[in-house]
Amino acid sequence: MSLHFLYYCSEPTLDVKIAFCQGFDKHVDVSSVVKHYNMSKSKVDNQFYSVEVGDSTFTVLKRYQNLKPIGSGAQGIVCAAYDAVLDRNVAIKKLSRPFQNQTHAKRAYRELVLMKCVNHKNIISLLNVFTPQKTLEEFQDVYLVMELMDANLCQVIQMELDHERMSYLLYQMLCGIKHLHSAGIIHRDLKPSNIVVKSDCTLKILDFGLARTAGTSFMMTPYVVTRYYRAPEVILGMGYKENVDIWSVGCIMGEMVRHKILFPGRDYIDQWNKVIEQLGTPCPEFMKKLQPTVRNYVENRPKYAGLTFPKLFPDSLFPADSEHNKLKASQARDLLSKMLVIDPAKRISVDDALQHPYINVWYDPAEVEAPPPQIYDKQLDEREHTIEEWKELIYKEVMNSEEKTKNGVVKGQPSPSGAAVNSSESLPPSSSVNDISSMSTDQTLASDTDSSLEASAGPLGCCR
């Protein structure tokens, strides 16, 4: 698909009508849900009202009007809404059964704490947090109010992107990741449905339910990223560091070029086979880093020489070289070759990726070197609590946010004028928000990303 290139403040744009005409990868059928969309006549109190959204009930502050379902996943349901106080459109995520078990409760706490800490233009902003319940005993629902974007990256991947758009989107991903890494936060769940964009090519990273701080003394968990985007060190049950996210970015970039998933494994074993068939069997030096049982399995697999990157990503898959920014297929391919490296010790860092010729044409110190977020809960990932203890911690966070909120925006977050959706673009209360194509909170299924499944014996333990 060929799109005209437009310049908007020297940055690329995307044709939202063409790019985002499809629904996102895991969507709610709005037309069928809206038929059952009715306001409850019984108000919770004078601040809240209830709306039936499919099989769920949203009990929200009156300031949020015209709720329309736009997405659902294992961890929540998302509605677009109009915020009458801020005069802008927002996304409201209701966490699904946050206190169902310890894993759900810990994820909810982690997501809330990290979203309150981060403050970067390439990470989704938390605008408000609330619960309709008034006491800890009644507490059961958590609502997160965020910026509303136009679509997730799943739709963009299907477009024929020119080099400007591709490199600018990647630059923004890397800026957001660097901001997280600067505070020792590893996202761990980067995938196209967790990255959202607007038609002006603004990009933001979503979903911190699986993010964790680096350096935890606990065994890191393998079931953390949708299988297709998992780094080799995750597949093989090794410890991992920040550049586990860089592998995921490489997979996303490769998908932008090929328009299909790079390593579509059916399970861990098939995933590993898909990787080595294309990139080659790793060297003995890497094998020595594996647990004995895993190493024994890997060493007994067929050996693959792998393909060169010009064969994996030939020029025919890339757009024409850019005259404006001198961006070339050879540069993009070189970046891919540095990201898609099996041995994490040899994989490019986020800092070096931002300095790569394919990326640094957009380099802005204010974006790259933004002050790191301050994580106030230093034991965020070492914490182990009962469900009731997690519930109390989350309730305190919500109450604390409500006290600190002024004019509906959590202190420390960008003001409406700096958010992705300008107030001039907001729809009045009587308008429809059905033209907002998507904002995905698509969570992968528990079988793919259940962080409760610890790596005590390595993910390839089934091969023993």
Swiss-Prot record:
It is a lipid-anchor. The active site is at D189 (proton acceptor). Activated by threonine and tyrosine phosphorylation by two dual specificity kinases, MAP2K4 and MAP2K7. MAP2K7 phosphorylates MAPK10 on Thr-221 causing a conformational change and a large increase in Vmax for the enzyme. MAP2K4 then phosphorylates Tyr-223 resulting in a further increase in Vmax. Inhibited by dual specificity phosphatases, such as DUSP1. Inhibited by HDAC9. One of its GO terms (molecular function) is JUN kinase activity. Keywords: ATP-binding, Biological rhythms, Cytoplasm, Kinase, Lipoprotein, Membrane, Mitochondrion, Nucleotide-binding, Nucleus, Palmitate, Phosphoprotein, Serine/threonine-protein kinase, Transferase. It holds the Pfam family Pkinase. InterPro entries: Kinase-like_dom_sf (IPR011009), MAP_kinase (IPR050117), MAP_kinase_CS (IPR003527), MAPK_JNK (IPR008351), Prot_kinase_dom (IPR000719), Ser/Thr_kinase_AS (IPR008271). A motif (TXY) lies at residues 221-223. It is found in: Cytoplasm; Membrane; Nucleus; Mitochondrion. GO terms for biological process: cellular hyperosmotic response; JNK cascade; locomotor rhythm; negative regulation of transcription by RNA polymerase II; neurotransmitter receptor transport to postsynaptic membrane; regulation of circadian rhythm; response to light stimulus; vesicle-mediated transport in synapse. The keyword Metal-binding does not apply. The modification Phosphothreonine is found at T221. Its EC number is 2.7.11.24. Its cofactor is Mg(2+). ATP binds at I70, G71, S72, G73, A74, Q75, G76, I77, V78, K93. Residues 433-454 have a biased composition (Polar residues). A lipid is attached at C462, C463 (S-palmitoyl cysteine). Residues 405-464 are annotated as: Disordered. The modification Phosphotyrosine is found at Y223. The keyword Kinase applies. The TXY motif contains the threonine and tyrosine residues whose phosphorylation activates the MAP kinases. Belongs to the protein kinase superfamily. CMGC Ser/Thr protein kinase family. MAP kinase subfamily. Serine/threonine-protein kinase involved in various processes such as neuronal proliferation, differentiation, migration and programmed cell death. Extracellular stimuli such as pro-inflammatory cytokines or physical stress stimulate the stress-activated protein kinase/c-Jun N-terminal kinase (SAP/JNK) signaling pathway. In this cascade, two dual specificity kinases MAP2K4/MKK4 and MAP2K7/MKK7 phosphorylate and activate MAPK10/JNK3. This is Mitogen-activated protein kinase 10. The gene is Mapk10.
